[in-house]
Amino acid sequence: MEAVGKHVKLFWNVYSDYAVLIAISLSYFVFDVLMLPFTRQFSLEDITISHPFALHEQVPTKYLGIICVFFPALVLYGFGKLRNNSLLFWKSLMGLLYSTMVCGLCVSLLKNAVGRPRPDFLARCQPFESTPKTGLVDVLSCSVPWSDKVLQDGFRSFPSGHTSFSFAGLGFLAIFLAGQLKMFRNKTSSWKVVVPLVPLSIASWIGLSRSQDYRHHKEDIAVGALFGFAIAYVVYRQLFPPLDHHNADILYVQAELDEGYTNVHSAGNSSATNAEQMV
């Protein structure tokens, strides 16, 4: 039994990160597809939800994974190859996936719980002509049936999923680049400051596009950006030292491995020296 316990512990130490990531990812996709939003009351006089419904979004959801996960993963792979360090790539990739999946799950739960109408909600709802123009009404005033996915999604405005996901993925990449390039070292080159701003600029553009498409209110976008970037930073700090650290580009686990190797190597040299002295 003791041997079995050791194997289970070893298995958990090695694969626990993968197991938790898979569980979070599955939960995210299940809740995102199956969970229904809270149907908040609204007013036909509310001009903030009276914008037209855009048939074509500037950044469709199907491209979000490519921009915010696949593209950053390629950059992480490039740094791993450049440094000849596969551990750097795999650990950073896990961080990227954790950042985006944790953010996606939390935002999905929050959006459905809050149930804030989108700026284009009335265009999705198409209220009956007999609906009172004053006062508050509910989803029963919509001529579009509740089973319609477009109407359901109209209650998922806060916070912005596109924006939070963008800053969770591209924000993680920006922090990673700042650390690898040691951006906060004294007398750093100006180009090292510009490079991390590129993914942040792309994430900001995605957030801005959600306002231009009338999918989100400005508060949804601002909170989504802060939330996504905060998760990215927290996840990053589980892997790397602070950005102003002299070894900001080295993984915690890498530093531990290198320190262990140094200690063993030093002990070996010390033993060899003692043996020579005895001879």
UniProtKB/Swiss-Prot annotation:
Q: Which residues lie on this side of the membrane: Cytoplasmic?
A: 39-58, 108-163, 209-220
List residues traversing the bilayer: 18-38, 59-79, 87-107, 164-184, 188-208, 221-241
The record describes its membrane topology as: Multi-pass membrane protein
Q: Name one Pfam family in it.
A: PAP2
Q: Where in the cell? A: Vacuole membrane; Endoplasmic reticulum membrane
Question: GO:BP terms for this protein?
Answer: phospholipid dephosphorylation; phospholipid metabolic process
* Keyword Ion transport appears in the UniProt entry: no
Q: Where is this region: Phosphatase sequence motif II?
A: 159-162
Q: What UniProt keywords apply to this chain's record, in alphabetical order?
A: Endoplasmic reticulum, Hydrolase, Membrane, Transmembrane, Transmembrane helix, Vacuole
Recorded hits in Gene3D superfamilies, A to Z, give:
Phosphatidic acid phosphatase type 2/haloperoxidase (1.20.144.10)
Q: Name one GO cellular component term.
A: fungal-type vacuole membrane
Annotated family: Belongs to the PA-phosphatase related phosphoesterase family.
| Function of the protein | Catalyzes the dephosphorylation of diacylglycerol phosphate (DGPP) to phosphatidate (PA) and the subsequent dephosphorylation of PA to diacylglycerol (DAG).
Q: Can you name this protein?
A: Probable diacylglycerol pyrophosphate phosphatase 1
Species of provenance: Schizosaccharomyces pombe (strain 972 / ATCC 24843)
